[in-house]
């Protein structure tokens, strides 16, 4: 009955369907070439779509650079194949325009499917409507909750949407963060004397805090753990590290935003205010994917007192707005030394050369997709530096690229370690 839920949207069959749809829509849109009276209209639409797509690539990848990682060329190709029938509407008349409009809708859906194959937020049809493993609630509802939530005759955790902006009177950063999402295990109610450790997670860029639960399966991972540990699990809180879906503040304190102060000072303070947690932040872990992974290492190297451990999944070698020079110019007023003063690689090298014990007691896990060559290179290098600087870290790869295929597995593989670092029995 539920076989449809397991239908893959990212396997070879799905890829074959995507390619077939792309060929079909393009071929139909090109049919007008064989007719002399419409040939130039079709060619005009084709050339215009190529120019617009190329222009979009230049703006996004070379000029604007809103994302720290380049987008795969296949995204631009699939988008261009959608723009072609869209522009054809302007060059056609009558019923042909209706056909082109239909092809445009199909091609746009196909482009979304291409993006999904690359980043895999929705690996199956069922992932669009996942089976809940925790009871979703507002923070107000959470405050009035006196017993562990139940589902299907068993105790489960709560998935709480919680305001966590750094704009309160006792906050320091002034960072207007989006709402965080927190998984609270059943033991929070069943055993109030427990001092549960915290795992703070950050999404990538583009991204939003709830992605760690909607696509990263963080609630499923935590539920699997608590189900075999008497309802006990680390509290998992996914927080905002960018300020907007496509924002890229590079996880630093700048004239525009104080993101590093928010994550190192305000987030722990606000979590302690809103939840009953282990007060010793050395039992806490901060982590993230892509931009979030880069940010986690930035926090640990700049503020080693804020957390005891970190997870860097598919992070970059350094915080970036595209190039080193662009980053220095836009965020540090052109001051290279100011950039180096907060850059993890430089801070680790300083600790190595000075022999300082700044990072003693800190542990971390670097994980990259085996096909994500830039992340493999960056994280293996940073792992080596981290160990030389006095941390205890490891580097590993899992099958996949720069996608949720990797990040779901990475979190599941490290969750026991996070719990153990937090003082829980594993």
Curated annotation (Swiss-Prot):
Name recorded for this polypeptide: Uncharacterized protein Cgl0967/cg1104
Record-linked Gene3D superfamilies: alpha/beta hydrolase (3.40.50.1820)
Molecular functions (GO terms): acyltransferase activity, transferring groups other than amino-acyl groups
Entry-linked InterPro entries: AB_hydrolase_fold, Esterase-like, Mycobacterial_A85_antigen
Domain of life of the source: Bacteria
Lineage, broadest ranks: Bacteria, Bacillati, Actinomycetota, Actinomycetes, Mycobacteriales
PANTHER family found in the cross-reference section: DIACYLGLYCEROL ACYLTRANSFERASE_MYCOLYLTRANSFERASE AG85A (PTHR48098:SF1), ENTEROCHELIN ESTERASE-RELATED (PTHR48098)
One Pfam family named in its UniProt record: Esterase
């Amino acid at each position: 009955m539920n076989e449809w839920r397991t239908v893959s949207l990212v396997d070879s069959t799905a890829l074959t369907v995507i390619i077939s749809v792309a060929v079909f829509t393009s071929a139909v849109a090109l049919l007008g070439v064989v007719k002399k009276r419409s040939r130039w209209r079709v060619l005009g639409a084709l050339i215009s779509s190529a120019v617009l797509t190329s222009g979009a690539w230049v703006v996004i990848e070379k000029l604007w650079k809103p994302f720290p990682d380049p987008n795969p060329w296949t995204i631009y190709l699939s988008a261009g194949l959608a723009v072609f029938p869209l522009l054809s509407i302007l060059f056609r008349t009558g019923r042909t325009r209706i056909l082109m409009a239909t092809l445009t809708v199909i091609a746009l859906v196909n482009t979304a499917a291409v993006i999904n194959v690359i980043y895999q937020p929705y690996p199956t049809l069922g992932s669009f409507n996942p089976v809940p493993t925790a009871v979703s609630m507002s923070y107000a509802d959470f405050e009035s909750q006196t017993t562990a939530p139940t589902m299907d005759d068993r105790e489960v955790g709560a998935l709480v949407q919680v305001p966590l902006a750094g704009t309160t009177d006792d906050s320091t950063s002034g960072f207007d963060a989006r709402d965080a999402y927190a998984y609270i295990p059943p033991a929070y109610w069943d055993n109030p004397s427990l001092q549960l450790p915290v795992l703070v997670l950050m999404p990538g860029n583009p991204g939003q805090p709830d992605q760690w639960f909607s696509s990263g399966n963080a609630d499923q991972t935590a539920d699997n753990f608590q189900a075999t540990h008497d309802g006990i699990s680390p509290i998992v809180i996914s927080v905002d590290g960018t300020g907007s879906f496509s924002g890229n503040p590079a996880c630093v304190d700048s004239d525009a935003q104080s993101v590093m102060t928010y994550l190192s000072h305000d987030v722990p303070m606000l979590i302690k205010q809103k939840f009953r947690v282990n007060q010793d932040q050395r039992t806490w872990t901060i982590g993230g994917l892509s931009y979030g992974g880069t940010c986690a290492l930035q926090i640990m190297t700049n503020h080693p007192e804020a957390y005891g451990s970190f997870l860097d999944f598919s992070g970059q070698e350094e915080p970036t707005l595209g190039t080193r020079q662009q980053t220095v110019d836009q965020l540090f007023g052109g001051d290279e030394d100011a950039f180096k003063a907060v850059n993890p690689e430089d801070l680790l090298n300083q600790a190595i050369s000075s022999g300082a014990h700044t990072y003693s007691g800190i542990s971390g896990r670097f994980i990259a997709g085996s096909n994500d060559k830039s992340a493999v290179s960056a994280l293996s290098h940073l792992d080596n530096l981290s160990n030389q600087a006095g941390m205890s870290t490891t580097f590993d790869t899992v099958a996949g690229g720069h996608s949720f295929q990797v990040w779901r597995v990475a979190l599941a593989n490290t969750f026991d370690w996070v719990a153990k670092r937090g003082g829980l029995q594993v």
